[in-house]
Structures are given as structure tokens and as C-alpha cells.
Amino acid sequence: MSKQQITSAKIRQPSGHFSHATMVEARGRIVFISGMTSRRADGTIAGIGDIEAQTRQVCENLKAAVEQAGGTMDDICRVDVYVRNMEHFEQIHKVRREYFRPPAPASTMVEICKMTSPEYLIEINAIAVIGE
């Protein structure tokens, strides 16, 4: 699979670790990954009150899902990020840089008021394209 970052001088450069657009030329499978939270496999919640720890667990959960489908984090082309506090933007992108090599996936981040558990600070869903 070939993934390419799309940029334009007509659009302000991203302020975080994401691409304006991501183009994929591939024959393969599209994988839609549900919203991942900081819940570990044993049911406990990682990093209660710690956005970096929660973001890291979310990324580990994304990684486990995409790897189970036969891909890698490099195959993730799009993420939607839901946060309880937009002031965590820099901390979240610091962790994302550890998991997403350039070209970073296209991304939307929105602040929401509630999640399925009051301890959750972040949730991310993703789309991956896994080449043959």
C-alpha cells in the first residue's frame, strides 16, 4: 500500500500531528476500527486523570486492532479523536507522534462533554487500508 500526504499552500499547515488529506493507492482491505478507549484487555482503565497515559493506551488498542486485521499503524489513514478537554491537544499529539510515522493520518479532533465512562479523557476511531 502506498500512502501519501496531501498538502496545499491554500490551506494553513496543521498545528498538530496530522495530514490535511491522505491519499491511498492500494489493492487490499479497508478496516474500520471502532472507537478505542483507555480500557485495557483486563477491563481496567489506564491512566485515570492522565491524558498522556490514556492516549498511549488508546494507541496501543488501535495497534492491537489493526495488527489483528493483518496491518500496522502505518496502514491507518484516518482517525477521529474525541476528547473531554481540548486543552490536552499538545499532550495528545506528543503521544501520537510516537505511534504515527509520517505521513500522519488525516484527522479530526472534537471536544465532547461525556463518554461511556466518566474516567475516559479520549477516544479514537480509525480507518486503515491494508494492502495485499
Question: Where are the predicted features?
Answer:
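Short, polar/acidic, helix-capping and beta-turn segments at strand->helix junctions
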Residues: 1-132
